[in-house]
Amino acid sequence: MNDNFKKQPHHLIYEELLQQGITLGITTRGDGLSDYPKNAFNMARYIDDRPYNITQHQLQLAEEIAFDRKNWVFPIQTHENKVACITKDDIGTNIDTLTDALHGIDAMYTYDSNVLLTMCYADCVPVYFYSTKHHFIALAHAGWRGTYTEIVKEVLKHVNFDLKDLHVVIGPSTSSSYEINDDIKNKFETLPIDSANYIETRGRDRHGIDLKKANAELLNYYGVPKENIYTTAYATSEHLELFFSYRLEKGQTGRMLAFIGQQ
């Protein structure tokens, strides 16, 4: 596949950003220690997996991306739209064990160096933000709830520079095979973007939704130039050899870890 995300042993990396001091990527599912499912490279401590497995996977990823896990930060995601400012004081949060810190956070941003923002995914949209000019990075977790409640807009509220200097990468997530019902469709029709651009009605109470496109449209609506938004062709629901899919695997699956850091 011709995509800016390039395959590595246990992750995909946005390769061209490495020379700009940005480490941006997402883990893949295979060649791990977890039985969730068998030989899975699960990165979530909050599902039924041995803590040892997640720690070993973290160490493996840290070596592959050359970013010490002691500098990672992980929030407790709740499918909302709250955003946290992260500093070096937060490094290590929820990495060795889960705590009450950063609970209810589905987006983070920082201006600090050597901090790796991380979150778990298995169909929801990872939205990465960066500006090398202003030394800014952010990461958002946008499922249908986060997309509907405009979590990308909430992140943009914390950008204190011209949005022409901001770049956004929309990472691997479910494709438009993901379907919603009439009630959820009606919610999306209240957003300030044209739902016809990302929702397709397929039958009674069945509507396919492209969450990646919805987030791209919202970002552009709120001022991020189209040419500054990159959307990967990788999809969790279309590439099960690479990714976990919560919906297709009926919840019995692991989680990928999306990450972004800057030197």
Curated annotation (Swiss-Prot):
Binding site residues for Zn(2+): H79, C124, H141
Family: Belongs to the purine nucleoside phosphorylase YfiH/LACC1 family.
The organism's taxonomic lineage, starting at the top: Bacteria, Bacillati, Bacillota, Bacilli, Bacillales
Keyword Hydrolase set for record: yes
Reaction equations catalysed: adenosine + phosphate = alpha-D-ribose 1-phosphate + adenine; S-methyl-5'-thioadenosine + phosphate = 5-(methylsulfanyl)-alpha-D-ribose 1-phosphate + adenine; inosine + phosphate = alpha-D-ribose 1-phosphate + hypoxanthine; adenosine + H2O + H(+) = inosine + NH4(+)
EC number: 2.4.2.1, 3.5.4.4, 2.4.2.28
UniProt keyword tRNA processing present: no
A GO term for molecular function: adenosine deaminase activity
Assembly information from the UniProt record: Homodimer.
Keyword terms: Copper, Hydrolase, Metal-binding, Oxidoreductase, Transferase, Zinc
Record-linked Pfam families: Cu-oxidase_4 (PF02578)
Role this protein plays: Purine nucleoside enzyme that catalyzes the phosphorolysis of adenosine and inosine nucleosides, yielding D-ribose 1-phosphate and the respective free bases, adenine and hypoxanthine. Also catalyzes the phosphorolysis of S-methyl-5'-thioadenosine into adenine and S-methyl-5-thio-alpha-D-ribose 1-phosphate. Also has adenosine deaminase activity.
Protein name per Swiss-Prot or TrEMBL: Purine nucleoside phosphorylase SA1030
Cofactor: Cu(2+); Zn(2+)
Coiled-coil regions listed in the entry: none
Top-rank lineage group of the source organism: Bacteria
